[in-house]
C-alpha cells in the first residue's frame, strides 16, 4: 500500500508492524547468552500485539523451511543488528544523563520501553511522542504486567506530522533546559523534506548542551526495492501487513551529519559494521544483511 500524508496504523499493520518486528528482535536479543541488551518488556508487548508470526519468531517456533528468504542465519543477523542498535542508543542515554541532562524526548516511540527499563537519575522526565493508539496500547499493556516507569513519563499522543512541538510544550516541556532527543528507526519513513523539518524543529527546541541520536541509511537514496519486496513477501504470506518497499521514502536527502552540523550541532557517526566489531559479533554476509545496506548511527551535541 502506498504511503499517504495522513495514513494511520496500529501495531499489527503498516509502519506500526515494523515497531512490533523491532520489539520481537529486542526480545530475542535479550535472550541471547551474549547479554548485550536487556529489554524485559519487549516480549510481553509483542505477545499483547498478538501477531502470530512475530510471537513464533520470538519463541523460535517458525518453520523457516516454509518461509521464503528466511534462514536461521538471516534471522540471527536481524537479531544481532537489533542488539547493537539498541545498545548504542541505551548507552547514548546513559552518557547524556551522566552529563547532567534530565529531559528526554523519544520521537515515534512505538514499543520502546526505555522509560521503564533504564536507570534514570532522580528528576529525569521522559516524553514519548507517537500516534494515540500506539501510546495507549503500550501504556495499558505495561500497566497490566505491573511495569512502572523509572522516570517521570509524559506521553504526547500525536503523529509527528502534526504540531508536535506545540503538544510537547503543552505537556510541560521546557526548551531552556538541555534535552536528550532520540529518533530511532524513524528517518527512512519520512520524506526527505520532512526529515529536514524534524531536525529544524528539534533545533528550535534545544538549548546548548542538548543532544540527539538517530541513524542514517545512505542506501535509502537508491535501495534495491525488488529485494526488499521479496523479503516483505515472506511476511505477507504469513499474514503480516508489512511491505517495506512501499513504507520507506527513497531518493536523495541531506546527510544527517552534515545537516546537523549546519544547524549548530557537533555530530559524529559510527557504522553498524563498526558496532559489530566493537561487541565481538560476526558481521553478516551481504546476502543475509539488511537490504538497505550499511547504517550509520549518529549522536550530536548542540554547541550554539
From Swiss-Prot:
Pfam families: LCM. The keyword Transferase applies. InterPro entries: Ppm1/Ppm2/Tcmp (IPR007213), SAM-dependent_MTases_sf (IPR029063), SAM_mthyl_Trfase_ML2640-like (IPR011610). GO terms for biological process: methylation. S-adenosyl-L-methionine binds at residues 130, 159-160. Its EC number is 2.1.1.-. Keywords: Methyltransferase, S-adenosyl-L-methionine, Transferase. It is an enzyme of class 2 (transferase). GO terms for molecular function: methyltransferase activity. NCBIfam families: mthyl_TIGR00027. PANTHER family: S-ADENOSYL-L-METHIONINE-DEPENDENT METHYLTRANSFERASE YKTD-RELATED (PTHR43619), S-ADENOSYL-L-METHIONINE-DEPENDENT METHYLTRANSFERASES SUPERFAMILY PROTEIN (PTHR43619:SF2). Belongs to the UPF0677 family. Exhibits S-adenosyl-L-methionine-dependent methyltransferase activity. This is Putative S-adenosyl-L-methionine-dependent methyltransferase MAP_4189c. It comes from Mycolicibacterium paratuberculosis (strain ATCC BAA-968 / K-10) (Mycobacterium paratuberculosis).
Amino acid at each position: 500500500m502506498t504511503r499517504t500524508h495522513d495514513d494511520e496504523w496500529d501495531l499489527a499493520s503498516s509502519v506500526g508492524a515494523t515497531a512490533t518486528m523491532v520489539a520481537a528482535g529486542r526480545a530475542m536479543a535479550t535472550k541471547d547468552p551474549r547479554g548485550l541488551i536487556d529489554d524485559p518488556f519487549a516480549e510481553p508487548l509483542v505477545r499483547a500485539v498478538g501477531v502470530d508470526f512475530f510471537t513464533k519468531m520470538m519463541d523460535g517456533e517458525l518453520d523457516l523451511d516454509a518461509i521464503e528468504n528466511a534462514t536461521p542465519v538471516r534471522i540471527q543477523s536481524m537479531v544481532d543488528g537489533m542488539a547493537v542498535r539498541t545498545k548504542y542508543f541505551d548507552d547514548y542515554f546513559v552518557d547524556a544523563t551522566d552529563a547532567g541532562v534530565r529531559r528526554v524526548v523519544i520521537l515515534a516511540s512505538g514499543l520502546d520501553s526505555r522509560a521503564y527499563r533504564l536507570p534514570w537519575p532522580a528528576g529525569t522526565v521522559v516524553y514519548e511522542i507517537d500516534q494515540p493508539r500506539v501510546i495507549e496500547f503500550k501504556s495499558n499493556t505495561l500497566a497490566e504486567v505491573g511495569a512502572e516507569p523509572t522516570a517521570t513519563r509524559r506521553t504526547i499522543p500525536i503523529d509527528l506530522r502534526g504540531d508536535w512541538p506545540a503538544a510537547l510544550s503543552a505537556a510541560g516541556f521546557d526548551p531552556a533546559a538541555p534535552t536528550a532527543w532520540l529518533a530511532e528507526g524513524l528517518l527512512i519513513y519520512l520524506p526527505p523534506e520532512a526529515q529536514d523539518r524534524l531536525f529544524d524543529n528539534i533545533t528550535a527546541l534545544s538549548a546548548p548542551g542538548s543532544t540527539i541520536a538517530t541513524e542514517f541509511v545512505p542506501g535509502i537514496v537508491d535501495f534495491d526495492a525488488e529485494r526488499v519486496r521479496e523479503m516483505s513477501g515472506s511476511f505477507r504470506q504469513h499474514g503480516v501487513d508489512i511491505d517495506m518497499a512501499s513504507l520507506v521514502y527513497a531518493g536523495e536527502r541531506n546527510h544527517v551529519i552534515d545537516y546537523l552540523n549546519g544547524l549548530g550541532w557537533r555530530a559524529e557517526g559510527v557504522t553498524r559494521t563498526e558496532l559489530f566489531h566493537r561487541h565481538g559479533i560476526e558481521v553478516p554476509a551481504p546476502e543475509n544483511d539488511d537490504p538497505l545496506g550499511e547504517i550509520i548511527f549518529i549522536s550530536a551535541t548542540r554547541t550554539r
